[in-house]
UniProtKB/Swiss-Prot annotation:
This is Biotin synthase auxiliary protein. Belongs to the BsaP family. It comes from Mycobacterium leprae (strain TN). The keyword Ubl conjugation does not apply. Probably contains an unusual Fe-S cluster. Transmembrane segments: none annotated.
Amino acid sequence: MVQDLPTPIGAGIYNIYTGVKHRDELAGASMPTVAQLGLEPPRFCAECGRRMVVQVRPDGWRAKCSRHGQVDSVDMEAKR
């Protein structure tokens, strides 16, 4: 399923909420609580770790990586 996600938030070596490489994280610190609840949009690109431009809207969010393109929460709902 993670392989089906767009590049900025799909399988990558960086955490999309903290920007830290997965192997550098402490156990249990990989996802903030608000992200676990689905209330926080991704802030970092999973592929390159760059900070993304994130726009939060009343109906969702849009995140754009300067190198890997854009992803929208509407696209995520379609994959559920």
